[in-house]
Amino acid sequence: MACNITNQRQQTLSTSGEALYEILGLQKGASNEDIKKTYRKLALKHHPDKNPDDPAAADKFKEINNAHTILTDMSKRNIYDKYGSLGLYVAEQFGDENVNTYFMLSSWWAKTLFVIIGLLTGCYFCCCLCCCCNCCCGRCRPKSSAPEEDFYVSPEDLEEQIKTDMEKDVDFPVVLQPTNANEKTQLIREGPRSYCTDS
């Protein structure tokens, strides 16, 4: 049980980004050539085929190989240098391109800003109303650029407008009235359909 706890402590995710360099015996920021040279030496020294009697050699070889794989991939190396093994875990979960966003949104100031805006807007209720419903029964609605005038039309003016419109349309009177229909009237005629009103 005690061994399990120490293994868990060793496997905790760090943010320093130095453990992989220490496995290879290098300083943080070493060049790619130094990483390759050191990897070759350590891989030959700890290879399981050269050390069949030492069970720890296989584990050490896996650690060396993992460190080399991460430190030679520039994208993973940049993430590791900036955020440590926690950054690599986040990259594995959300993708390399989302690591910066994750750490930005999980920073103390982003969390604080989220809480403050939530409190000021009543659990974001006010933000939703402003965006969707113009808030507070329309009182916060943006003002229109044209001034609103009360538009009133008197019944006499409306009647005069209708007469004027009818005088303009005198050229096209309605001449065909609909035919009377009853229960026995056939609604669909037999034969070709005609949409003309001249018949």
UniProtKB/Swiss-Prot annotation:
Main subcellular location: membrane
Q: Which InterPro entries match?
A: DnaJ_C_subfamily_member5, DnaJ_domain, J_dom_sf
**Domain J span(s) in chain numbering:** 19-84
Q: How is it modified after translation?
A: Palmitoylated.
Q: Which UniProt keywords apply?
A: Chaperone, Lipoprotein, Membrane, Palmitate, Phosphoprotein
- Places the protein is found: Membrane
Q: What Gene3D superfamilies does the database record attribute to this sequence?
A: DnaJ domain
Quaternary form? Interacts with the chaperone complex consisting of HSC70 and SGTA.
Query: What protein am I looking at?
Result: DnaJ homolog subfamily C member 5B
